[in-house]
Amino acid sequence: ANRKINDNLQQQVSVLYQSWFENFELSNGICPENWSCQELSTIANIASGKRPPLKSEVCNQETPIPIVGAASIMGFTSESNHRDKILVTGRVGTHGVVQRFNSPCWTSDNTLVITSPFYEFTNQILCRIDYSSMNRGSTQPLITQGDMKKVIVLIPDEETLAKFEEFAGSLMARWEKNCDENIKLALLRDTLLPKLMSGELDVSAIEI
């Protein structure tokens, strides 16, 4: 149920962005004169990830921190290189997957890490970039920091941008809460299921 709700929340934010910043429905279909095309680096900081100090396939007390790869979690390590709210996309290998993190993690050296005071607006931009046109690699796909910084985007006035962040942020706060609940439920399942299968946990006396 949470996954369906989250899909709907993401879709609502995407439709809102399209309505305001692509179809210009706030201004009768015309781009306002006080909006301007600028480089992505004017609203976002873009950096590369780093190679983790160690890598484990298992999440435990020694390696509790997820290592973020170009498209997904690729392992676990002992320390974080980010504790802030970040957006992550692939630098080497897989391109076009945008990941959100708001908890300690280690962004690997095949990622680009994006931070911005306009987090939700920047997220929508990243989800719409044509990454294939930026690829510099021949045998292995590669996108550079410099190319990402120079992506031209339409920047609205501060008031409109703040309103979008408020609306989109409230929807995505619900999304994050649902994601946290899904993780807790998965951990509970993974803890209880082996005990049920082995008979260690007896539920025969429970009335349903």
Describe these PLM feature segments.
Residues 1-68, 154, 158-204:
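Non-catalytic DNA-recognition/assembly elements of restriction-modification systems
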Residues 31-32, 36-158, 207-208:
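DNA target-recognition domains and sequence-specific DNA-contacting regions of bacterial/archaeal
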